[in-house]
Amino acid sequence: MANKAPSQMERSITTIIDTFHQYSRKEGHPDTLSKKEFRQMVEAQLATFMKKEKRNEALINDIMEDLDTNQDNQLSFEECMMLMAKLIFACHEKLHENNPRGHGHSHGKGCGK
């Protein structure tokens, strides 16, 4: 039996994991993001979704502090995924924002547009 190609969602999950590791292994522990790595990832990978936040160093620091639940000044993959979940939820809501059908179910242009 031939291997089935990964689905779009499976590829998206793999991309998120790979992107996290692309930044997490730059300095310190290879499986956590330092403040510098987190800022670099937000600026490069979330530039459209977080365009206001990425220009504000203090806001980036506040976001990291909120995500850093064990207060070790690093973000584990799990802690970082809390941000991804919030962004996905906010993006979903934004897609429905101007739709007269609400969640009835058509999507607009997308987040960051």
Swiss-Prot record:
EF-hand domain: residues covered: 13-48, 55-90
Entry-linked SUPFAM superfamilies: EF-hand
A GO cellular component annotation in the UniProt record: cornified envelope
PROSITE patterns: EF_HAND_2, S100_CABP
Molecular function via GO: antioxidant activity; calcium ion binding
Modified residue annotations for Pros-methylhistidine: H107
Membrane topology: Peripheral membrane protein
Ribosomal protein as UniProt keyword: no
Phenotypic effect of disruption: No visible phenotype. Alters response of phagocytes to stimulation with bacterial lipopolysaccharide (LPS).
Subunit structure: Homodimer. Preferentially exists as a heterodimer or heterotetramer with S100A8 known as calprotectin (S100A8/A9). S100A9 interacts with ATP2A2. S100A9 interacts with AGER, and with the heterodimeric complex formed by TLR4 and LY96 in the presence of calcium and/or zinc ions. S100A9 binds quinoline-3-carboxamides in the presence of calcium and/or zinc ions. S100A9 interacts with amyloid-beta protein 40. Calprotectin (S100A8/9) interacts with CEACAM3 and tubulin filaments in a calcium-dependent manner.
Name under which the protein is recorded: Protein S100-A9
Organism: Mus musculus
Gene encoding the protein: S100a9
